[in-house]
Amino acid sequence: MQVLHVCSEMFPLLKTGGLADVIGALPAAQIADGVDVRVLLPGFPDIRRGIPDAHVVSRRDTFAGKISLLFGHYNGVGIYLIDAPHLYERPGSPYHDTNLYAYTDNVLRFALLGWVGCEMACGLDPFWRPDVVHAHDWHAGLAPAYLAARGRPAKSVFTVHNLAYQGMFYAKHMDDIELPWSFFNMHGLEFNGQLSFLKAGLYYADHITAVSPTYAREITEPQFAYGMEGLLRQRHLEGRLSGILNGVDEKIWNPESDLLLASRYTRDTLEEKAENKRQLQIAMGLKVNDKVPLFAVVSRLTNQKGLDLVLEALPGLLEQGGQLALLGAGDPVLQEGFLAAAAEHPGQVGVQIGYHEAFSHRIMGGADVILVPSRFEPCGLTQLYGLKYGTLPLVRRTGGLADTVSDSSLENLADGIASGFVFEDSNAWSLLRAIRRAFVLWSRPSLWRFVQRQAMAMDFSWQVAAKSYRELYYRLK
C-alpha cells in the first residue's frame, strides 16, 4: 500500500498551526505500521532548507509555470517538493504577505499543489506511484478534483483539520487551473458562486475524515459546518465520513525525556513535577507557592478558543487563590485584557505575549491545570499534551476535547476514568463551575494525584491513529 500525503506544512520544517504537527508525526507512525508513505509539500524556503538532499525527479510546464519535482528525505520519511520559486520563494508566512494580505496568486499556488498530487498518481515519478492520495485541508483540496477529472487513477482521502478555512476564489479562476467548467456547480466545487477548494476536497474525495469522532458528527450540523452541512450529512449517510483522532508525538511531548523541562518525571515520579512548577512561577513573575493550583493557557488569543471566557472568569479564579500563566498572541483586545490583569494582580497572573515552542513545554510541565475552553475544537492537541504531562485539562465539551477528556465527576472518579474537568455551555458561569470543581479536587491531594496518573496512562499515540488510517485505506482499495 503506497500513500501520498498532500499538504502545505510539516513540523518542524514549517508550522503555522496544528496541521504541521500532524504531518510531522503521522507519516513516520504509518511507516512503522507497514505502509509505504511519502509527503508532497510546496517548496517554501524553510522546507527547502530542511531537506538539503532533495534532487530533481521530474520537470513539467504547468498552468502555473515551469516546475521541478524534487525528492529527498526528512527523519526517515520520503518528501516530494514542488520547486517553483516564482510561486513559493517568499519570506514569512506561506499564505500571506507581511501586511497579512493573502497572496493574490494563492489560487495558482495551491491549485498546483493539488494538481501535482494527482499527477503523482499518473506517474509523475516513474519509480513510485501512490494507491491513495491523502489530501489535508483546503490547500490540498483540489487533489481529489483533479483525480476525478483524470478518471480516478488512485483513491483519495480528504482530511478536515478545520472547516472554518475554506479556500474561496473567484469563479473566473476556473479558466486558470485546468479543471473542466462542468465541475463548477453545486454538485462540484462551486459554493456561493465562488470556487471553493475545501468543497472540492469534500465533494470529490472517496472518503472524508475529520480529526476527531465528535467533530465528524458536529460538522454535519449547521452551527459547525459553515454551509457544508448538506454535503457532509450526505457523505455521513453514505458511510464516507468518519473521525480519526489525532495523536501526540511522544518523541517531542514526553515528560520522561523532555530536555526542555527543569525536572523530568513519569506517572510514578510525579513529585518531580514540583520543580517545574517552581521554575515556571519564577519565570512568569508569580509568587512561588506549591500550595495553590497554577492554571495555564497556551493558545491563540481568539474568541473561538474561548479566551474571552477565561478573561471574564479570571476574577473568580483569583479569588479562590489560584494563579494563571498565559502564553499566546492574537486578538489585541484580549491581549490588552490579560496584560491589564497581570498588572493588576502581580504575583498571581503572568502573561507572555507571543508563542515560543520551548516555553510551551515548560508551561505544560509546570502547570497544574491547562485551560482549553474552545467554542469549537476539531481535535485539539493542547489537552492531549496536558494529559501526557499530568497537567489536568479543563475543557469545553466539543470536538476532540469531548473525545479525550473525562470530567472528574463522582461517577468517573469511582470508575477510574476521570482525567480532567469538562463544562458544557460556552459562558463564563459554566467555566467557573468547572474551575470550582478543580479547586475541590485540588483540596484532596491524593485524589488529584490519582487523576493525574489516570490521565498520564491514556494512550493517544500516533500508532493508534496510524492503524485506523491503514484500515481505512484498505477498505477503499
From Swiss-Prot:
Q: What is its EC number?
A: 2.4.1.21
Q: Print the keywords alphabetically.
A: Glycogen biosynthesis, Glycosyltransferase, Transferase
Q: Could you say which residues bind ADP-alpha-D-glucose here?
A: 15
KW Glycosyltransferase (keyword) present: yes
Q: Which InterPro entries does the record match to this protein?
A: Glyco_trans_1, GS/SS, Starch_synth_cat_dom
Record GO cellular component, one term = cytosol
One Pfam family hit: Glyco_transf_5
Q: Part of which pathway? A: Glycan biosynthesis; glycogen biosynthesis
The reply to whether Nuclease figures as a keyword in the UniProt entry is no
Q: Report the CDD domains cross-referenced here.
A: GT5_Glycogen_synthase_DULL1-like
Q: Which family does it belong to?
A: Belongs to the glycosyltransferase 1 family. Bacterial/plant glycogen synthase subfamily.
Q: What is this protein called?
A: Glycogen synthase
Q: Which organism is it from?
A: Salmonella typhimurium (strain LT2 / SGSC1412 / ATCC 700720)
Gene that this polypeptide is encoded by: glgA
